[in-house]
């Protein structure tokens, strides 16, 4: 009975170790070390064309260049189609994208991108109280 207990406990420890190893593994293409500083212009934000501005920096605060970023704007409620635009790098690590906000209210801005090293980048920002013209 002592040998069966040792085998059973060993099996449990192996399963736990595998589970911990899988749980601690960083998913590929996670862009964990990238910081995104987000701005929107003009202020206050009004219905019509706006410019989405953001800066990408790495873990040591160097600009992240060469990213391909799509900007998506969604109303926070159902019933309106999202709007999309491609961001352009205007200087190293600084990206801008025009985006038409067609309705007053709260918007969610999503960044979908690929960094120059192939890592994926996904970020979300809330833009509250877009004012009517």
Predicted regions and their residues:
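Coiled-coil-like amphipathic alpha-helices with heptad-repeat character
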Residues: 2, 20-21
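N-terminal soluble domains immediately following signal/targeting peptides that reside
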Residues: 24-133
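Intrinsically disordered, low-complexity sequence elements enriched in Ser/Thr/Gly/Pro
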Residues: 5, 23-24
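Bacterial N-terminal signal peptides that target proteins for export
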Residues: 1-11
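Bacterial N-terminal signal peptides
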Residues: 10-20
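Short, flexible active-site loop motifs that bind/organize anionic cofactors or intermediates
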Residues: 3, 14, 59
């Amino acid at each position: 009975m002592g040998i069966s207990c040792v085998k059973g406990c060993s099996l449990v420890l192996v399963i736990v170790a595998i589970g911990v190893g899988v749980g601690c593994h960083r998913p590929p293409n996670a862009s964990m070390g990238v910081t995104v500083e987000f701005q929107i212009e003009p202020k206050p934000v009004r219905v019509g064309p706006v410019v989405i501005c953001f800066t990408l920096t790495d873990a040591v605060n160097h600009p992240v260049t060469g990213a391909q970023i799509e900007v998506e704007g969604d109303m926070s409620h159902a019933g309106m189609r999202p709007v999309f635009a491609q961001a352009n790098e205007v200087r190293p690590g600084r990206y801008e994208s025009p985006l038409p906000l067609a309705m007053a209210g709260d918007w969610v801005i999503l960044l979908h991108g690929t960094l120059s090293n192939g890592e994926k980048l996904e970020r979300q920002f809330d833009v509250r109280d877009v004012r009517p013209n």
